[in-house]
Amino acid sequence: MKLPIYLDYSATCPVDPRVAEKMMQCLTMDGLFGNPASRSHRFGWQAEEAVDLARNQVAELLGADPREIVFTSGATESNNLAIKGVAHFYAGKGKHIITSKTEHKAVLDTCRQLEREGYEVTYLEPMPNGLFTLEQIEGALRDDTILVSIMHVNNEIGVVQNIAAIGELCRSRKILLHVDAVQSVGKIPVDVEALKVDLLSVSAHKVYGPKGIGALFVRRKPRVRLEAQMHGGGHERGMRSGTLPTHQIVGMGEAFRIAKEEMASEGQHIMALRQRLWDGIKDIEAVYINGDLEQRVPGNLNVSFAYVEGESLIMALKDLAVSSGSACTSASLEPSYVLRALGLNDELAHSSIRFSLGRFTTEEEIDYAIKLIRDSIGRLREMSPLWEMYKDGVDLNTVEWAHH
């Protein structure tokens, strides 16, 4: 077993060796290095063929038509293209958008930008388990609502929203539905027909593919129109200009092919490991799980250890690669906005750790992690005056702290 142990698969995954192998064949003179848009020679045709195959592989995992797949530089761009693209194209119909407070920053900040442009955005608040009710969404719909954007699986707490029901509602009201499926695709079944989504963002690097490549599913029937956000040579049916990076697209295709084949067995393996981890730490005193445990993706475990500072715990767990909050915002010392939206107080939000398991996680690593967590929590709490007060029966919410 090698240290440190990687338990941060929700931040990124290592590239699967089979994917890396395929990518290597698209880079050098003796490989498929051509520009897929070069129509006048074999180098271009071969590259185009490789891109077409990958487009089919991505479409197959999503239950989509390959013509509905638009390649982008990643899910951040996919989210921007979907939300701004729809908002700008349908501005004549209305300027109201609905999303949630627990979305990824790539959705929230895109909506903030649209607010600066004169659009109105409603931010829904989740229930304490991280889920939304259909009534909440229905109650927020207006005559001028043009788009609802809700993530399938949350990146911090791993809860799975009932997208099919939301899709049904939006379809009946003729409102477009965009779904950020970065954390669900390849982990749980995602079928764009069953979910009734109009736009769906995916990324390769959360599915053991390379970073820097993603895709946006854009429905053809009923047809969804977008205003391009990147202008140039008119690639990707005019929706996203820029030379297609053959090696990255091929890598994404292979990653999605493997995911389709291995998702069921891999899900069981990861679920068993997560259960092993939770069973190993759940009897520690004052430990709380964040988000619904039933409606949850297999690899995610988000836990708050009361009376332990999250940052100091991460330092104590230096042999484990874990995070507090998401990687995208972990540089800030603010408590997780996702956990705050669930109603957690600052202290509990600050003491949360996200463990995310994946394809290459082993039982041996989980057992090592359990021992390390138990030892570290015990040691850190011994040093904590708050823990001492809690053990003495002091209700810490009633304590008046002096401000100097």
Swiss-Prot record:
Top enzyme class: transferase
Domain of life of the source: Bacteria
Family: Belongs to the class-V pyridoxal-phosphate-dependent aminotransferase family. NifS/IscS subfamily.
Function (record text): Master enzyme that delivers sulfur to a number of partners involved in Fe-S cluster assembly, tRNA modification or cofactor biosynthesis. Catalyzes the removal of elemental sulfur atoms from cysteine to produce alanine. Functions as a sulfur delivery protein for Fe-S cluster synthesis onto IscU, an Fe-S scaffold assembly protein, as well as other S acceptor proteins.
Pathway(s) this gene product operates in, as recorded in its UniProt entry: Cofactor biosynthesis; iron-sulfur cluster biosynthesis
Name of the protein in its database record: Cysteine desulfurase IscS
Quaternary assembly: Homodimer. Forms a heterotetramer with IscU, interacts with other sulfur acceptors.
